[in-house]
């Protein structure tokens, strides 16, 4: 079974990292798929985000990191992945993610989506929030891995 965990990861947060670590324990392997979303201007380009993720996940040998563009369901099809992993922080996430899961299922009936609730220590985190705190010089070391913290401080100085 191949499991896909897609996202923009702009930037990777400790919430993402925790979810990846927990999924690796449950499933034994995971493909982290970094989206190149051409309709948005990311803080970090695709190459930098992949480097941040590789560095932050170097202790997990069963994680594959790839990039993709377009529909997540197409990425899953290309990889022959039959399970998409998504994290849930709050009920509002569930409503949005359920809609996406149903859309993916309508595009490929063999695709299933599994939800993992976020660790309560990270339930408040989002990439947007982290960038906002970093932009104004707030402390982010408890929100992101060290390599991401360094990059954000450099970006916003």
Curated annotation (Swiss-Prot):
State the EC number(s). 2.7.7.3
Q: Where in the cell is it found?
A: Cytoplasm
> What biological-process terms (Gene Ontology) are attached?
coenzyme A biosynthetic process
Residues annotated as binding substrate are: 8, 40, 72, 86
Binding-site residues for ATP, renumbered to this chain: 8-9, 16, 87-89, 97, 122-128
User: Superkingdom of the source?
Assistant: Bacteria
Q: Which UniProt keywords apply?
A: ATP-binding, Coenzyme A biosynthesis, Cytoplasm, Magnesium, Nucleotide-binding, Nucleotidyltransferase, Transferase
MF term (GO), any = pantetheine-phosphate adenylyltransferase activity
Cytoplasm found in the keyword field: yes
Catalysed reactions listed for this entry: (R)-4'-phosphopantetheine + ATP + H(+) = 3'-dephospho-CoA + diphosphate
**What are the GO cellular component annotations?**
cytoplasm
So which cofactors does this thing need?
A: Mg(2+)
Coarse class of the primary localization is cytoplasm
Pathway entry: Cofactor biosynthesis; coenzyme A biosynthesis; CoA from (R)-pantothenate: step 4/5
| S-S pairs | none
| InterPro entries, sorted | Cyt_trans-like, PPAT, Rossmann-like_a/b/a_fold
Where is the site Transition state stabilizer? 16
What is the protein's quaternary organization? Homohexamer.
State the family it belongs to.
Belongs to the bacterial CoaD family.
Q: What does this protein do?
A: Reversibly transfers an adenylyl group from ATP to 4'-phosphopantetheine, yielding dephospho-CoA (dPCoA) and pyrophosphate.
What HAMAP family does the annotation carry? PPAT_bact
Q: Which PANTHER family match?
A: PHOSPHOPANTETHEINE ADENYLYLTRANSFERASE (PTHR21342:SF1)
What is the name attached to this protein's record? Phosphopantetheine adenylyltransferase
